[in-house]
Amino acid sequence: SRRQRQMCIRDRLDMLLFVEERINTTIERCGSVISVNDFLASPDKMDIFDATCMRLQTIGETVKNIDNLTNHELLINYAGTPWRSIIGLRNIISHEYLSIDPEEIFKIVKVHLPGLLLAIQQIRNDIAASI
């Protein structure tokens, strides 16, 4: 029904907004992180690293849920974003935490998250325009 479709669209928009907020929070809270060593320099810095990993995990989990909710038909339209890698990182953080490479996390935060943010914003805009 039309109402169910609107609810489903609203759920997608809410989930995308959640991802956008998590990305913004991660970028903001890692603003003082200039090198990978900044994640490891002290117990407080290691707390930032751990919190960053947990936010990346929730981003990956939510992306996975969006993909499942849309029967794998939404994210595929945005092929420039490495969705499988985002979900894969979630799996590594969840199941292989001791094997996490701080350099990779640093690179993800500083290099890849801004692009993911743009992709999420584009998807939200495209969905909103289709309502």
Name every feature range the model reports, one short phrase each.
Residues 1-9:
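Single conserved hydrophobic/aromatic residue that forms the stacking wall/gate
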Residues 82-100:
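Histidine-centered, metal-coordinating catalytic motifs and their short helical/loop contexts
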